[in-house]
């Protein structure tokens, strides 16, 4: 098996790491890396594909690369944002060469390294995470690709599931002028109003 490695910190999206996706029976997570790290990670993935191709196609026709484990993010109007999300997955189970079905699931840890086993725990979009994974390049019928196989997730900064705090998800951008929310100031204003009654 390929060596397990880790990503740098990134923002999590569409994480299903405690309970598998019902339709495909896989655990999944996408992460958005800083733009400075995106090209570096893409190059690392491409090098793994190139190694696999060179190893198995010497003197033969090069296969077409059909699968990269990332997708380009689009805004609400369908325009590319320049951001890339990398996709990691793990099958809920697999069958060994001996015909034995093996169940598996990713390990999930908090920032302090404590294992999280609560099946109701959810990672909301925008949470800051690191992902442990290994690359699985493949060749099949003249085509090549690579999958990023999920092993574990460390949650550094949790955004609670169901609370989408990423304005870009709704097509909003930061405005230079206008309202800026200050929780302490709002709390003081509410206290003042309450005292008046």
List where the protein language model places each region.
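Exposed beta-sheet edge/beta-hairpin loop segments within beta-rich domains
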Residues: 109-129, 136-146
């Amino acid at each position: 098996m390929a060596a397990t490695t880790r990503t740098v910190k990134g923002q999590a999206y569409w994480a299903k790491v405690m309970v598998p996706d019902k339709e495909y029976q896989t655990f999944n997570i996408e992460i958005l890396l800083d733009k400075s790290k995106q090209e570096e990670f893409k190059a690392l993935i491409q090098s793994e594909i190139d190694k696999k191709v060179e190893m198995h196609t010497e003197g033969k026709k090069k296969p077409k690369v059909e699968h990269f484990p990332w997708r380009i993010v689009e805004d609400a109007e369908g325009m590319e944002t320049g951001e890339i999300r990398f996709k990691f997955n793990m099958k809920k189970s697999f069958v060994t060469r001996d015909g034995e079905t093996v169940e598996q699931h990713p390990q999930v840890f908090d920032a302090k390294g404590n294992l999280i086993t609560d099946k109701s725990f959810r990672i909301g979009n925008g949470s800051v995470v690191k992902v442990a994974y290994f690359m699985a390049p493949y060749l099949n019928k003249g085509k090549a690709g690579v999958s990023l196989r999920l092993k574990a997730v460390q949650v550094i900064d949790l955004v609670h599931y169901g609370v989408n705090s990423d304005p870009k998800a709704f097509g909003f951008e930061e405005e230079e002028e206008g309202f800026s929310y200050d929780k302490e100031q709002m709390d003081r204003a509410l206290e003042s109003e309450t005292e008046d009654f």
